């Protein structure tokens, strides 16, 4: 009788909400700290996101930098639901490894009704244990981190019970510093909430344009100087528009059509030390000798870079984009010795382009500070659809 009464007393926790911002939430999504009080202490490592119409997606949970977040599987949820900047999402944990998700489109605040079902075969769940006391099982696979349980409570121990994973990306170990983590968690994420635009017409693609101040444009040369650039000799002729790179072809021909719709997105995240840090940077001479010999086509546009503190994205120099009138779509493919990896692009007002998932490239290639990477741009005319990566180890320079 007592057990039945206890079960009847169970109530679903309240919902938490978030506004989708592609610059921060394309690869992972952080669960608010204030919601930790409403999820079980033994939190599953794999959960189901049940979207509009009962459609489901399997998503992994992780603890990074004292935060619980949705990681593997979240980018697929974003793509399948075509989330755009300004979309409003609510989440409620139902106590059975399932989050009920509602989506409200930013352009009209209407609730989404249904999407395509994308539920993968469930595997045996491991758990993230949230407990008020340390537990010592002696297992080598356990990692202990201290995170706040809630805004008004003390700190609790988080024990992540790791499962063996055959994924080569998980097996590879990349160590730079405690500040460089694959979660792309940056101080920008916690400083301020950017202003989100509302589209006037449904169905139009949105291109992320980050406003940069006049000061940033004035110091463009300094801010981009941490990337070592070596440009291939290329004459842009009218007939070059029809030429294709022979080494690789995009999956769909229509990807060569770039979107030029530029809503006014103002990113107001402050970086007070940007100007000071930019002045301290010094340009470094290219270290790769005769880079053309590494390229699939010596005439392709290319630039040289190495492992930086800013690991979560690759920067394409604004001057390079201007010189060759380069165009990028919403996604571009990295190509390395492991294959192809699709990554989202972020386009700045001053024409620099940032490409996400660079951390994963660094990890799976086990890059070190002394290594150099030659980035070869594969294109149709001026449209860049892929970046071929040639890794030259420090000992070979």
Swiss-Prot record:
Location(s) in or outside the cell: Nucleus
Transport recorded as keyword: no
Domain of life: Eukaryota
Pfam annotation, one family: B3
Residue ranges the UniProt entry marks as DNA-binding: 14-107
Region listing for Disordered, in residue ranges: 118-255
Alphabetic keyword roster: DNA-binding, Nucleus, Transcription, Transcription regulation
Protein name per the record: B3 domain-containing protein At4g34400
Acidic residues bias locations: 161-186, 212-227, 235-246
């Amino acid at each position: 009788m007592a057990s039945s009464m206890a079960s009847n007393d169970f109530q679903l926790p309240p919902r938490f909400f978030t506004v989708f911002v592609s610059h921060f939430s394309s690869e992972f999504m952080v669960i608010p700290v204030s919601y930790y009080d409403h999820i079980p202490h033994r939190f599953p490592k794999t959960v189901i996101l049940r979207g509009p119409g009962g459609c489901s997606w399997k998503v992994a949970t992780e603890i990074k930098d004292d935060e619980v977040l949705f990681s593997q599987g979240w980018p697929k949820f974003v793509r399948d639901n075509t989330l755009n900047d300004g979309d409003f999402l609510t989440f409620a944990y139902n106590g059975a490894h399932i989050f009920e998700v509602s989506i409200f489109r930013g352009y009209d605040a209407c609730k989404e009704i249904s999407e395509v079902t994308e539920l993968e075969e469930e595997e045996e769940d491991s758990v993230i244990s949230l407990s008020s006391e340390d537990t010592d099982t002696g297992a080598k696979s356990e990692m202990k981190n201290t995170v706040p349980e809630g805004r008004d409570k003390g700190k609790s121990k988080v024990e992540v019970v790791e499962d063996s994973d055959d994924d080569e990306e998980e097996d590879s170990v990349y160590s730079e510093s405690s500040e460089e983590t694959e979660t792309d968690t940056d101080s920008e994420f916690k400083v301020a909430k950017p202003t989100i635009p509302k589209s006037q017409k449904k169905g139009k693609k949105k291109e992320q344009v980050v406003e940069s101040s006049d000061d940033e444009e004035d110091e463009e040369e300094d801010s981009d100087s941490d990337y070592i650039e070596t440009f291939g000799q290329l004459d842009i002729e009218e007939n070059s528009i029809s030429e294709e790179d022979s080494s690789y072809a995009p999956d769909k021909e229509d990807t060569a059509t770039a979107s030029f719709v530029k809503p006014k997105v103002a990113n107001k995240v402050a970086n007070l030390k940007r100007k000071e840090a930019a002045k301290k940077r010094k340009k470094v001479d290219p270290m790769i000798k005769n880079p053309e010999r590494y390229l699939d086509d010596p005439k392709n546009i290319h630039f040289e870079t190495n492992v930086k503190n800013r690991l979560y994205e690759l920067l394409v120099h604004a001057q390079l984009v201007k010189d060759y009138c380069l165009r990028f779509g919403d996604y571009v493919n990295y190509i390395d010795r492991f294959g192809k990896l699709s990554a989202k692009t972020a386009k700045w007002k001053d024409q620099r382009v940032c490409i996400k998932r660079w951390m994963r490239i660094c990890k799976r290639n086990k890059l070190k500070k002394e290594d150099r990477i030659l980035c070869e741009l594969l294109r149709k005319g001026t449209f860049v659809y892929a970046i071929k990566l040639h890794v030259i180890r420090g000992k070979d320079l």
